[in-house]
């Protein structure tokens, strides 16, 4: 407005005519104004902002510029001497008005100045722009590769004697790197493009232990597709020293797993971690082909823990239909295997979270015996009758479950349903009594 106030009317008209007609044109002008010496770093910063899993703080984003992606060793390395003194000003200078810095003095967050900036940078429209603008088009795979590589360059500078707070102080990006680098590396084919992963997973170097100390990814993931948790299934937690092979399998890094099998074959059959074996760790992440490779080399897909629950028990508990099929059809796991209280996977499917009729149906279709009894004599039909699971009970009786069998207290499923006043269940069971 100050410019317009000092212009003659004809100049004002000409100024207005030269204004960008769209947001795209506005952003293109901003990109063209980025100085040549800072173009590469601006592009990397924008790439990282696009794919960051959580908002990045000023010091975290600025740390990426201290990574030499063209190090003579061929592996990107952190160069502490490259760190900016005035990080906020340097970021704003590099990325111009495309970014904004918000938050308190204790936590300054870098974000795009408008949501449309991210949409513009990743848009196919930008991919067809002139060469000076095309360099800023952001494809997701290269962007994830840049951020994963930056994170890895931090992690291979850690050692296992440094406390978490000191580590984070040494590198502001250490916390983010430890927690999220795997998720960036898992995007499409990024893991195969990262340089230096072998160093992080080398058991003879301190970096692997330091990473696990800073953030341990070996925890059952909090969504339904994960098929077991130790607290409910009884599998032994971390019974043994963690191995890089186990973690590589957990991450689904196929090339790295194959290298580690050759270099450290003693780790293939080792028992450790939440999932106990590398093969089960791979299965937990749906890395089925990798699990098969590990299984062929001697890693069990059916370890048993302190309560003798099998992997199939856990899959049934979580109603994980795909995993049940893989374990039974591909690996021949005993579908009627019992734990130390006599529970089969079918019992677990009825007790599970969630308890799915489809899981019960699948187990029965693949040969689960509906007459198997717990140590107290209870059958799956006793369980369904007590809980009022009409659909489950119907499936069980259709597959031959007896309504007359007694538990150790002499109760039939009908007795149990009567005691719980399950009227609809009583009607169903009466209809299937022996004539």
Walk through the language-model features, giving the residues of each:
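Ankyrin-repeat boundary/"N-cap" motif
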Residues: 235-245, 270-280, 304-311, 338-344, ...
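Conserved ankyrin/ankyrin-like repeat signature
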Residues: 255-256, 289-290, 322-323, 358-359, ...
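Alpha-solenoid repeat scaffolds
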Residues: 37, 56, 161, 191, ...
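Leucine/isoleucine-rich amphipathic helices and adjacent mixed helix/strand linkers
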Residues: 1-270, 277-296
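Ankyrin repeat domain, specifically the short helix-to-loop turn at the C-terminus of the second helix
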Residues: 259-267, 292-300, 325-334, 361-369, ...
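Leucine-rich solenoid repeat scaffolds
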Residues: 406-435
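Ankyrin repeat A-helix N-terminal signature
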Residues: 247-252, 281-287, 314-320, 348-356, ...
């Amino acid at each position: 407005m100050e410019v317009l106030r000092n212009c003659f009317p004809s100049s004002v008209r000409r100024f207005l005519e030269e204004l960008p007609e769209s947001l795209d044109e506005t952003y293109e002008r901003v990109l063209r104004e980025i100085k040549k010496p800072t173009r590469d770093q601006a592009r990397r910063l924008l790439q990282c902002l696009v794919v960051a899993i959580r908002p990045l703080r000023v010091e975290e984003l600025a740390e990426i510029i201290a990574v030499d992606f063209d190090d003579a060793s061929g592996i990107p390395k952190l160069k502490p001497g490259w760190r900016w003194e005035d990080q906020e000003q340097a970021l704003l200078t590099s990325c111009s008005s495309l970014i904004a810095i918000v938050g308190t003095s204790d936590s300054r967050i870098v974000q795009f100045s408008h949501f449309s900036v991210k949409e513009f940078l990743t848009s196919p429209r930008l991919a067809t722009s002139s060469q000076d603008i095309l360099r800023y088009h952001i494809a997701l795979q290269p962007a994830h590769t840049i951020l994963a590589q930056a994170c890895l360059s931090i992690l291979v500078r850690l050692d296992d004697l440094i406390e978490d707070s000191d580590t984070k102080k040494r590198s502001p990006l250490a916390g983010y790197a430890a927690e999220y680098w795997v998720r960036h590396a898992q995007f499409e084919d990024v893991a195969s493009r990262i340089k230096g992963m072998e160093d992080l997973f080398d058991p003879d170097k301190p970096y692997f232990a330091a990473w696990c100390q800073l953030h341990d990814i070996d925890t059952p993931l909090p969504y339904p597709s994960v098929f077991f948790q130790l607290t409910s299934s009884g599998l032994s937690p971390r019974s043994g020293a963690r191995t890089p092979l186990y973690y590589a399998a957990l991450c689904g890094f196929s090339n790295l797993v194959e290298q580690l099998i050759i270099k450290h074959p003693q780790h293939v059959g080792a028992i450790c971690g939440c999932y106990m074996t590398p093969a089960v760790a791979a299965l937990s992440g749906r890395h089925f082909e990798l699990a098969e490779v590990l299984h062929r080399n001697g890693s069990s897909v059916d370890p048993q823990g302190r309560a003798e629950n099998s992997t199939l028990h856990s899959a049934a508990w979580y109603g994980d239909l795909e995993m049940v099929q893989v374990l039974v059809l591909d690996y021949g796991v005993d579908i009627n295997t019992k734990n130390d209280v006599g529970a089969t996977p079918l019992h677990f499917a009825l007790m599970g979270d969630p308890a799915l009729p489809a899981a019960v149906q699948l187990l029965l279709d693949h040969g689960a015996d509906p007459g198997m009894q717990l140590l107290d004599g209870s059958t799956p039909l006793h369980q369904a009758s007590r809980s009022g699971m009409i659909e489950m009970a119907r499936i069980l009786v259709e597959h031959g479950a007896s309504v007359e069998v007694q538990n150790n207290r002499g109760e039939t499923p009908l007795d149990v349903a009567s005691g719980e006043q399950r009227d609809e269940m009583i009607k169903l069971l009466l209809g299937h009594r022996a004539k």
